């Protein structure tokens, strides 16, 4: 009744942002991996508003003879997940694989993902082995994965690795979702009936620097928290109750101590009062920040603006054409 359809065509979706150094090698290795599949295939490169010559290299690759590369040019930078969603809207395969352009996740792993998906899985995730990232990146990744596992209840080990495979019905369902803050691996797992993970190699970044700065990682954390669950709002209410009870109890204690020990003792407790006050004020600001994040995302969803604007799509052996903005 739930048998998965056979995979006849594979689409590889790769967001690109200022990756001119790695693009030639990326295209060569991804093409070689796809040619070994024994299935129809296509590669979709999405330029996410690069300021270098990435777009020109992509267009050139699409216009070569016997090319299987579709180049999608966004008019500015919208972020990794928005760029991937733009690629999803143009795929024609039965199985869609996402891959980063930095070559830290080797394209040579693509046949393994296809083979695993052929076993009937809706989503095939990956777990990076012997990660070649900084200690900060590794620590942040562990915190994010733990947060996701606790809030979703799905114990997948590496949500941060974008080398993943999705069956077409999962992609079509995600495209019908219109929330502005989208984290694709989590969204896919919400709709997947069968999901699994396989270990993959992880290499050092050969060209350029990571596009995820400290502030972008912080923004990603906020996106994850607010798009996953309303639990922080409930925890905020609980925290407020605990603080209120603690503050009231402390006030009663201070009054009793003042009556018992005299005003001299109370004067010496001024700094403790300030510490307590600042603690309460800090808790209030944290709560206001969380509420603001939720309200801001609701505001963006209500406006229903497109996630991105596709400026051009270059198909193999075709001329560029301009498209309207796409949801």
UniProtKB/Swiss-Prot annotation:
Q: Which Gene3D superfamilies match?
A: Spore Coat Polysaccharide Biosynthesis Protein SpsA, Chain A
Q: GO molecular function: any one? A: phosphotransferase activity, for other substituted phosphate groups
The protein's Enzyme Commission number: 2.4.2.53
Question: Which reactions is this enzyme annotated as catalysing?
Answer: UDP-4-deoxy-4-formamido-beta-L-arabinose + di-trans,octa-cis-undecaprenyl phosphate = 4-deoxy-4-formamido-alpha-L-arabinopyranosyl di-trans,octa-cis-undecaprenyl phosphate + UDP
Naming one, the record's GO cellular component terms include:
plasma membrane
Q: Which residues lie on this side of the membrane: Periplasmic?
A: 257-269
Q: Transmembrane segments in this chain: where?
A: 236-256, 270-290
- Judged by the first EC level, this protein's enzyme class is transferase
Q: Where in the cell is it found?
A: Cell inner membrane
Give the main localization category: membrane
HAMAP family referenced in this protein's UniProt entry, alphabetically: ArnC_transfer
> What the protein does?
Catalyzes the transfer of 4-deoxy-4-formamido-L-arabinose from UDP to undecaprenyl phosphate. The modified arabinose is attached to lipid A and is required for resistance to polymyxin and cationic antimicrobial peptides.
- What is the name of the protein in this document? Undecaprenyl-phosphate 4-deoxy-4-formamido-L-arabinose transferase
Name the source organism.
Answer: Salmonella paratyphi C (strain RKS4594)
């Amino acid at each position: 009744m739930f048998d998965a359809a056979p995979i006849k065509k594979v689409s590889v979706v790769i967001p690109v942002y200022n990756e001119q150094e790695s693009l030639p090698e990326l295209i060569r290795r991804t093409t070689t991996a796809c040619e070994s599949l024994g299935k129809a295939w296509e590669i979709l490169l999405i330029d996410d508003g690069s300021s270098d010559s990435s777009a020109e290299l992509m267009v050139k690759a699409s216009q070569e003879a016997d090319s299987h590369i579709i180049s999608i040019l966004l008019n500015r930078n919208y972020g990794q997940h928005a760029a991937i969603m733009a690629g999803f809207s143009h795929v024609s395969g039965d199985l869609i694989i996402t891959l980063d352009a930095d070559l830290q996740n080797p394209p040579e792993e693509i046949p393994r993902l296809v083979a695993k998906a052929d076993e009937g899985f809706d989503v095939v995730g990956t777990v990076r082995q012997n990660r070649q990232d900084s200690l900060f990146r590794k620590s942040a990744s562990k915190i994010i994965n733990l947060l996701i596992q606790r809030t979703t209840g799905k114990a997948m080990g590496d949500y941060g690795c974008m080398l993943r495979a999705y069956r077409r019905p999962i992609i079509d369902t995600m495209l019908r979702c219109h929330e502005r803050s989208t984290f694709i691996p989590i969204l896919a797992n919400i709709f997947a009936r069968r999901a699994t993970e396989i270990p993959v190699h992880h290499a050092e970044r050969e060209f350029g620097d990571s596009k995820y700065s400290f502030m972008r990682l912080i923004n990603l954390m906020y996106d994850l928290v607010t798009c996953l669950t309303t639990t922080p709002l409930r925890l905020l209410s609980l925290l407020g109750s605990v603080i209120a009870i603690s503050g009231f109890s402390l006030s009663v204690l201070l009054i009793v101590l003042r009556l018992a020990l005299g005003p001299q003792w109370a004067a010496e407790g001024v700094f403790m009062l300030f510490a307590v006050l600042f603690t309460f004020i800090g808790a209030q600001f944290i709560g206001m920040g969380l509420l603001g994040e939720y309200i801001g995302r609701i505001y963006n969803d209500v406006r229903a603006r497109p996630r991105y604007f596709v400026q051009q799509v270059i198909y193999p052996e075709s001329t560029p054409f301009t498209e309207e903005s796409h949801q």
